[in-house]
Amino acid sequence: MLMIISPAKTLDYTSPLAIQRYTQPQMLAQAETLMQTVRTLTPAQLGSLMKISDKLAGLNAARFTEWQPSFTPENARQAILAFKGDVYTGLQAETFSEQDFDFAQRHLCMLSGLYGVLRPLDLMMPYRLEMGTRLHTPYGNDLYAFWGDSITRQINQQLLQQGDRVVVNLASDEYFKAVRPAALEGELIKPIFMDEKNGSMKVISFYAKKARGMMSRFIIQARLREPEQLKAFDLEGYAFAGETQGRQGRELLFTRRHSAISPAR
């Protein structure tokens, strides 16, 4: 099965690497094309477009200026180790074994506003460009128009390479909107994580993001191959609570009682 997750805004380019091996992004030509447009923007324009502070706008303008497509371990880092956010807190890739990284490389991909689709060991230079950004390019008025169906084609290629036809959607709605479900050459499954709040079950953003990372780690470390095996997910108090047919495919519901959440969380 092929897991799809979102990237993160927070990046880490300083901590020790858990693995030295690396690969190159497969959609680098498109990233170069996109960078030609991004580099025409001033820091003030970036700040307005991305709705970020002057400080962050200046930082990312400098990143875009320094960006060049010859990625090496000296100027880039493996994507799975560079992203640091709630999903990646749950994923804990820094604890992976070599065998875990091997499995992840075949069965996990990260969507990206700049790089399209990244495999775990693909090098990337630091950037910030969210998929929902309304950046005007020759292809249209936003990044969804820029990427068109190319992200879906890349996912289908990875499905073919990894040997089965199951896609596990663990990405946010913003990022999965860049995928065309009807064109996916595989069964689509979406785990949904809900936590108890004020006596009812709700999707709580922080917990749901972390749970998506934990589900990814569960699949990777258990080397899961079959959709039914996902229902055994029980990390940090979650339990399978049922299955429904959503608009785009099967939805697996996992719930957690408030009492199952550690006070340290």
Swiss-Prot record:
InterPro entries per record: YaaA (IPR005583)
A GO cellular component annotation in the UniProt record: cytosol
One Pfam family recorded for the sequence: H2O2_YaaD
Domain of life: Bacteria
GO biological process assignments: response to hydroperoxide
Family, as annotated: Belongs to the UPF0246 family.
NCBIfam families: PRK02101.1-1, PRK02101.1-3
Name of the featured protein: UPF0246 protein NT01EI_0662
